[in-house]
Amino acid sequence: MKFKEFDKPEYFVNRELSWIKFDDRVLSEARDKNLPLFERLKFLSITSSNLDEFYMVRVASLKDQVHAGYKKTDIAGMTAKEQLKAISRQTHDLVHVQYSTLNRSLVPALEKAGLHVIFEHEAFSEKQKEFVDQYFEDNVYPVLTPMAMDSSRPFPLIRNKTLNIGALLSKKDTKKGKEEIDFATVQVPSVLPRVVIIPSEKKGHTTVTLLEQIIERNIDKLFLSYDVICAHPYRIMRNADLPIDEDEAEDLLVEIQKQLKKRQWGEVIRLEVEDRKSTRLNSSHITITYAVFC
């Protein structure tokens, strides 16, 4: 074999796809039943935070290349657009395995260890409903800032990596005699613990739920003059790549500080919504993506 043949694309693996394989290897630690349960949960959370950073930096960089019309292939023979398609396929597979690991392996193991997790507020018992409703009134409601979008109120930008709840609201327009549908959102407050201990129905068990489920159950209290059609959690990733030219920057530290501030408001790279979302809400998200998130 001639030495020059070693530069053939088939001899190389794309850097971004190789990174996804790395994150999958981290995920394999979460599936290892020989490890302590909370260590497995920690590895699962690491794969998720890794994926966030991957999208905000590496995927964002590829999108910038596509927008700039850059069509040169990488060492593995893939253009930026081809890489994005392959990344989408493989990350969907990775996320599927993440949730499969959580729901089929870790959650049952937690249950066996005496920790019951309620992921959907519809599953609350009457006693639990009473508790979370009071918890909402006392602790959550005072720190919420609901925001609705209509013709008179421009929608604010959603902060990077924040967890939010999107809702479709219905209000009958009596003048026009038709129903008006508005989109509203509320950020899940980071000042409160996301995991909330609630009364347990099983003796000797600890039961917990997620803060967003408490808000979702009580979201109608935020929009008293509307009917809430549906409400579901969502999260966005923004472009956090730092395009700094060290040679051109007069003050590198100042330039880095400027770019870090911009990271919260960069172009939207990824939108995450829960699997059981309403198709009507999903269609509304698609329609208003650029108006709301960009």
What is the predicted function of each stretch?
Residues 2-280, 284:
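N-terminal non-catalytic structural scaffold regions of very large proteins
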Residues 281-294:
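Single conserved hydrophobic/aromatic residue that forms the stacking wall/gate
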